[in-house]
């Protein structure tokens, strides 16, 4: 316990100024944004491929496999980048958010099988491949405290997303039919990805203020 407390104290001592409540909220809210994108991409890309992009059942099923392969590759890749190149978790979160938005835009606006497959692999890589765990490292950076407490709050935001997305999807389907619903849902995920980019950029600016050095 003393060692844990010493680590927390050292992390707090490294700060030139205390992070605002808004900064602490943002690092936690990333869990909601990331989980919403991840859950939505996992559950609804196949339906999107079938009903919006006109893919065959076989092609749409392939999207799920490509997404999974992308996410497995990413876990290994980011672990290497952060361990070997000492990349800041905030830098990884920013890259993840930008590439997730690009991938979602690709899925939404370019209805060609090859482009959709590339975009889905990118989604798996950048949205699912360890982005949540990296976000938790950002929480510890800006809000040093007992890991159990921070993880608990972070998981609560994740839980809210995995509860909300199916509820929203069900309401949209009821209101406008499946094809319109999955399209609206993908637009919503793109908005979430853009919010994640804006949050990350704000945190990059705050990092300079709080720690006296750039995060990138």
Model-derived features: positions:
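Helix-to-loop junctions at the C-terminal end of transmembrane segments
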Residues: 74-88, 173
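Symmetry-related core transmembrane helices of the 12-TM Major Facilitator Superfamily/SLC fold
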Residues: 184-204
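Interfacial helix-cap and linker-helix signal at transmembrane-aqueous boundaries
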Residues: 49-50, 81-82, 168-179
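Intracellular juxtamembrane helix-capping segments at the cytosolic ends
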Residues: 129-143
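Structural signature of the two symmetry-related core transmembrane helices
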Residues: 91-105
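A late C-terminal transmembrane helix in Major Facilitator Superfamily
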Residues: 141-176
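Extracytoplasmic gate region of multi-pass secondary transporters
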Residues: 19-75
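Hydrophobic core of transmembrane alpha-helices in multi-pass small-molecule transporters
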Residues: 115-130
